[in-house]
Amino acid sequence: MRITLSITNSEPQGDDQELLSLEVYPEMTIETLRSSIQAETTHHPSAQHLYHNGQLVHDNAKTLGELGVTDGDMLALHIRDMRGSTTTPAAARAAPQSAARPAARPPPAQDPEVIRLQILGDPNLRGELGRSRPDLVAALEDPQRFARLFADSLDRERRERNERQRQIQLLNADPFDIDAQARIEEIIRQERVMENLQNAMEHNPEVFGTVHMLYLEVEVNGYKVKALVDSGAQATIMSPQCAEACGIMRLVDKRFSGIARGVGTANIIGRVHSAQIKIGPLFLPCSFTVMEGKQVEMLLGLDMLKRYQASIDLAKDKLIIQGVEVPFLGPADIPVETEEAVEREPTVPGPAGTTIGQRSGAVHAPSGQSGAAPAQRPQPGATPAPAAVAATPSSQPRAPAAPSFPREHIDQLVALGASEQRAIQALEATGGNVEYAASLIFQD
């Protein structure tokens, strides 16, 4: 049978492209085919890169029949001498004229056309490259643009590598300098860290996704709250603003006040010994520790989960409590404060222009890099932001209601033992009637 080879020569003195027709047989090995090509073109087998159906042929022991080559097929042959240009007779004849040129400008270590053909023939490789370098994938159909982008990427890596080597050489000038050796160790460590990061993004990219917390919609005293389920918390916690909104702030036992110590410290106002909480269709008694400094309204801790033998089923994305399955809230229903905290977290630069969150490990695309930088600058002074965010649930309903009722009416209800917000809620429920509002407060 007869096959045709489309030869692309990347050597400076070779033809750009030529066609070669060869008489072969199915039992011919790739090694024999390379020898036949060398006899016809003088190209050494090590410089021959054969492609069949877009796939680079690596195994010289395989036959043409095993590769599926049939009569009339066309194979691509890309010529690039990995050993340099001094082995072929043509290069040897031109050595006096071109000896200075290869020395001044050595050939690149990787041929863009070979890389481009490999990516075109491997859908998996194309998908992986699309996640890290979408600009290269977009230029696959344009060889010149791909070669330009690929060369720019190699030049950038080469400059960074040369700069690191230069720093190491400067530091090695005095091998007995302890500080210089410590800096060399740090440079090498950073290289290993970036290599580990690159391997993780390539082989285990799912670890860089954003993990959403587990929230349930519950009710306390008729007030709906989005509670965070945290099996690592010892007690069930509620913010003072949420306790005000639920109308149980008056039940806080301040003898249980103190300081909570863990990752940080928080002020414990007191404890509500018993209040009714609705989880799904269940009405359950629950105790709450009222604590400041939390950016969540309520946190269901281990005391509540163990008391009712609750089970967190991540496969079903549900909380199973006393045989009842209660679904967790979806990402769109999670409180805005939590998502804003993720957006405000500081980032570190990642490969290919991406940024990675320091706490969540989430990878952000290069297009979001400009938006992440402003969020990182105010971070050192943004520590009180969670308290300000947590204060909004109580301040939002209070602001529009204050002008609606006379101040003396609110003060009368507060004198009965109700909180200011509970007094406003009672006035809203009774249309501003102080007597009816007082009776509602007494019913509490």
Swiss-Prot record:
The keyword Chloroplast does not apply. It is an enzyme of class 3 (hydrolase). One of its GO terms (cellular component) is cytoplasm. The active site is at 230. It is found in: Cytoplasm. Belongs to the DDI1 family. This is DNA damage-inducible protein 1. It comes from Chaetomium globosum (strain ATCC 6205 / CBS 148.51 / DSM 1962 / NBRC 6347 / NRRL 1970) (Soil fungus).
